[in-house]
Amino acid sequence: MPQIAYADEPRINPLDVVERLAAVNDWSFERASDDEITILVTGKWTDYQVSYTWMGDIEALHLACAFDLKVPERRRAEVATLISLINERLWVGHFDLWVTEGMLMFRHALVLAGGTEASGKQCEALLGNALDTCERYFTSFQFVVWAGKSAREALDAAMFDTSGEA
C-alpha cells in the first residue's frame, strides 16, 4: 500500500473555533490552555460543563459534557446498567461514569486527521448532539440515583415522559 505524504502546514486550532462559538452564544467559558476550553451551558434540567480538548497526537477534538449529578457508590452498578442500555440506542457519542468521582458525562470526538480543519458547524453539531442527548436522558439518571428505580424502569419512564412533550 503506498504511503501518502501530507504537508505539515499550520492549521487553525479547533479550540479557536469553539471559543468563537461560545462568544457568539454569550456562554461563559474558560480557555485553560491552547489545548483545552470549558464552556458552561444552561439546559432545561441542569447546567452543563462542556470541555473540549484538542488531542494533537491523534488529531481529534474531544468533547466531555458533565452535569451535576453525583452517583453514590450504592447506585453505581444500576447506573452502569442504565448507561449500557442508553449507549445501545446512541448512534454517536456515549455516556461514561468516572467511578472514582461518581461523575456522569457524555463523551464524543471529532476526528480531524490529515490536517482537516474544524468548522463552526461541526463544533456546533458536536455540542448540540451532546446537549440534546444529556437533556433526553437526564431524568433517567435521576430516577436511578434519587428515586431508586431500576435502569429499565427509569429508561422507560423517561422515554414515556419525553414522547409526551410537544
Predicted region positions:
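Short, highly charged C-terminal tails/helix-capping segments
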Residues: 142-166
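Short, internal acidic amphipathic alpha-helical interface segments
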Residues: 66-103
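Long, contiguous binding/interaction regions
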Residues: 98, 108-110, 116, 122-135, ...
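Short, intrinsically disordered, mixed-charge
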Residues: 23-24, 81-89, 128, 132-139
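Terminal, regulation- and interaction-focused segments at domain boundaries
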Residues: 1-20, 66
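Long, hydrophobic, amphipathic alpha-helical segments used as structural scaffolds
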Residues: 33, 91-94, 98, 137-149
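Short histidine-centered catalytic/ligand-binding loop motif
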Residues: 6-7, 64-72, 116-119
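Ser/Thr-rich, low-complexity intrinsically disordered terminal regions
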Residues: 20, 24-48, 52-63, 68
